[in-house]
Amino acid sequence: MSRYMQRPENALKRANEFIEVGKPARALDTLQEVFRIKKWTYTWSEAVIEPIMFKYLDLCVELKKSHIAKEGLFQYRNMFQMLNVGSLENVIRGYLKMAEERTEAAQQQSSQAILDIDDLDNLATPESILMSAVCGEDAQDRSDRTILLPWVKFLWESYGQCLELLKVNSHCENLYHDIAKMAFAFCLKYNRKMEFRKLCEKLRKHLDDISKVSSQTANVSISKPETQQLNLDTRLNQLDCAIQMELWLEAYKAIEDIHGLMTLSKKTPMPKTMALYYQKLAMVFWKAGNQLFHAAALLKLFQLSRDMKKNVTQEEIQRMTSHVLIATLAIPLPSAHPEFDRFIETDKSPLEKAQKLAVLLGLQQPPSRVSLLKEVLRLNVLQLAAPQFQNLYKWLEVEFDPLNLCSRVQGVIEEITADENSPYTQYTQALQDVTLVRLVRQVSQVYQSIEFSRFLSLAKFANSFYLERILVDCVRHNDMQITIDHRNHSVHFGTDLSESQREDHPDGPTLQSMPSEQVRSQLVNMSVVLHRAIATINPNRKKADRERLRNQMVKNYEENMVKDHQRILQRQKKIEDRKEYIERVNLEREELEQRQLEEAARQQKLAEMRRLEQENEERERKRHENEIQMIKERNMKDKIDQIKQSASGQKLLKKIDEEDIKKMNAEEIAAKEAEERQKERKAHDNNLKSQEKKIDYFERAKRLEEIPLIEKYLEDKLVQDKEFWEKQEASRIEAAIAERKNAEQVQERLRRMQADRDVFWQKLKGERSNAFAEKLKVFNAALEEERRRRLAERVIQRREERRQKWLREKEEERRRIEEELRKQREEEERIERERRAEERRIENEKQRVIMEKQRAKEEEIERKLAEEKERLKERAPRGEKEERGGGGGGGGAWRGRGDTAAPAESAAKPESDWRNAREAREPAPESAGASSAAAPAPKKDGVWQPSGRFREGRGAPGADRPPRGDDREPPAAAAGESKWRRGGGGADDDKDDGPRPRVGAGDRGPMRRGDGDRDDRGPMRRGDRPPMRDGDRPGMRRDDRGDRREGGAPDRRDFGGRGGDRRDDRRDDRGPRREGGGERGGDVWRRAPQEDRRGGAAGGESGGNWRNARQAEPAKPREERRGGEERPKEARAAAGPDEDGWTDVKHHR
């Protein structure tokens, strides 16, 4: 492993470089370091790690390193099983897909290796013959063992690793079951029976593990319905594969698992699942040789199909009932002594085994042949079955006709076997056995002895050995008294009168009792006859006893009637109370469980969120630390690479451990390198000096001493070789002489047999030549016939190919035309979409231009309002001088510059004259100019009060207010208050331009006329407001107000806690208002007249009204409109100022 940590991107690039130069093992090691180093593995996202993982698994598959792939998969699961389950699923599925593709390629390669034979005429080469003789395998088996089996083993290990990886993870539960089904398909495809057994055991162990209680919230819980359904589907697939592979023990275990899962589930399984379960269970019982439970399973399947399946045809019902009936009739007759099995040492008794099998079928007790026949009759199966099977039931279970029994049953069996695809063929042997046992029982009731040949003629489908075995089995299992006399060729029945055959009544048709049965029941019959005689002699005795007993019972009933009735009622009440209590307890328990589940889910969610937050923080911290560490290690790596370039540096790095290198810095390593280089130089010098002394003396002396020894050894070797050759030559000559003599003797013996050999050779040659000629003639005829047949097939095949080619061309032409039409439609739709998009773009451009013009106009308005405000501030001193010169005017009331009326004159004017105030002011342009100039100026303590919004005394903000009209008397006038209290007594006091602001609720409290002693500041005049502090808000402009609501509702304002109304309080539900004071739409505001702001008439500054520039048409006079009529919204927007100088301003949101 490398000493240095690389970034994942660099590791992937490095691995690709190794792959390009043909070193996949080095590439795998490079990628493996990414998952081994855990410092920063959890800091990277799946977008970085997932490509590395795919390349890592690809290399593992290529090199068949399943254990290395397992290590990487476990690390990847720990990283992303909580963050991105989809990435983990993609990685595992990709890994298994790669392994399956490689295995299929190996299988094709193995098959191709057999076809790639050089000489087809000489298939059996000497090598193949020797290999088949040694190992007992053919060429295909050997090819599979060398090419296919390694990949099959790798794929099997991959499936097992993935199942172990995902066995307890609830997030990957679907993937776990998909892999299990893929493993079943793998075992079925490659016929791996041993692996299938191991897989079943592994899945069963996993199911046991998840059935245990676990405290981890991410684990799989068997109590969830989804988990139960997934396991049930997997076990059904397992059962199907086991049946196809004929592993009946594994199929039975799978059935037990399926039954356990269905029992564990709270809801009833689907009928389709139950039908499949009973069908497979019946097949397993039949393969196990248990015909009784096989018939019971078919009966349960019939009941389920009839009750649950809709639109069942009559043919299907007849087929199912016939199957049930014939399976029930094929059950062997029960043994008279089943307790014999208890003498056999087994783990469980037959009764326990039968009870266990009955539980799999949902039965309370094990079935029997008699009970199944009764159930068949009760469910009307006999009447719904085919007629021939109804007759079969009548012949076997009802009628007593031993002479024609086998012949009748033989006809039904021949009818069944005539159809090769009939599902009833498997029952023929069992029906023959049952028929023969019935025949033996019926013959035993008719004959005491019968000739064996006569008995064999009655059994149409049995031979002598088979019939003798049936007789022996009847004696063993059914406790019949049968003796076979082989000397006289006869059979005797019921010869021992002292032994009875069975105590219970035998099933099936009977004619009379056996002699031994009559002897056994003699005392019982005597007792019955004596009781009848006593009843005949004294018939009243029993009647009197019955009457006395009846009276006693009536008396007891009358005495205990009320008590028993009350006891029954109390019992019923207790039962009802108990039911209600149980229901209430169950309901409370369910609610408690639901609350606990919700609380657990909430806690789990919170814990998961906290965990994710902690992981993110930890990941960020580690990432920061890793970046710093990587910078340090990169510098260290550069230094070490420089040191590696020298031989001394390489030796130094080999001597130092990895841990020591991590603790050292670059300077220390350089010092170590210099020290090591100095040591090597000294050692090299010393070595040269010592070698210089040894070479001249030791080598020359050694060579001089060994020269005579070598010469002596060569002389001795020459003498020994000569003696050995002489001995071998003498022995060879002797053996050749002996072989010559033996060959001459053999030649003399064989010369006497030469004539006989020639005769035998000529005879054998003639016989073989004739046989060869006959075989050659037959072969040539067959060859000619096969040639004609293949030529005819080739003609038909070519004709069909031409026809299919014509059909394909026709279909392609049709598809081409449809494709052209589709493209044409798409082109038209695209042109239409582009046209609509262009129209929308042009419309949007128009709207944008309009909005820009409107925005420019609003900016112009704001600029003009600001200039007007500056002009008002400049004229404020002159207005104060004119007000002082004009008199008090009511103590602080606001007046226009053109208002010259005296205060006394204003006070003397009656307040009921307020309706005519507007008509009196209209001819005075100077007064109107002064009023309009003063309109935006009212403030209270530095806070702008919107003119004409609320009037004092109109109720609390947000309350329902009556609509304001011109004919309603102002509240202040009705109460006798002065106009000074309402905020001014100038010429604009009684103009009905909208709701008035609430004045008098400021910091000073309500101010009354003549209350000068309570206010030290004196009378308030225009411009005498106190200086503004930093926290005070300046007067608000009209364009500073927010959007108005739809429907004309007024704005809601919050004036900074100075007593004003909040934005959410100022509702106005008064409805439409007339003339200038009426409400406009939600986006239309009223603007005061702007001409002659500096005291002039309509002449001086009238050009500054931009609304007048847009509309040259004069406003419609008030007299020409009806009273209370409000101009339409469109007319107001385009008409300009009205007769009072007010203008509708459109507010854009």
UniProtKB/Swiss-Prot annotation:
The keyword Cytoplasm applies. Residues 925-937 have a biased composition (Low complexity). It is found in: Cytoplasm. Keywords: Cytoplasm, Initiation factor, Protein biosynthesis, RNA-binding. Residues 886-895 have a biased composition (Gly residues). Its main location: cytoplasm. GO terms for molecular function: mRNA binding; translation initiation factor activity. SMART domains: PINT (SM00088). GO terms for biological process: formation of cytoplasmic translation initiation complex; translation reinitiation. Transmembrane segments: none annotated. Residues 317-498 form the PCI domain. The keyword Oxidoreductase does not apply. Pfam families: eIF3a_PCI_TPR-like, PCI. Residues 811-885, 908-924, 961-970, 1005-1095, 1113-1132 have a biased composition (Basic and acidic residues). Component of the eukaryotic translation initiation factor 3 (eIF-3) complex. RNA-binding component of the eukaryotic translation initiation factor 3 (eIF-3) complex, which is involved in protein synthesis of a specialized repertoire of mRNAs and, together with other initiation factors, stimulates binding of mRNA and methionyl-tRNAi to the 40S ribosome. The eIF-3 complex specifically targets and initiates translation of a subset of mRNAs involved in cell proliferation. Belongs to the eIF-3 subunit A family. PANTHER family: EUKARYOTIC TRANSLATION INITIATION FACTOR 3 SUBUNIT A (PTHR14005:SF0), EUKARYOTIC TRANSLATION INITIATION FACTOR 3, THETA SUBUNIT (PTHR14005). This is Eukaryotic translation initiation factor 3 subunit A.
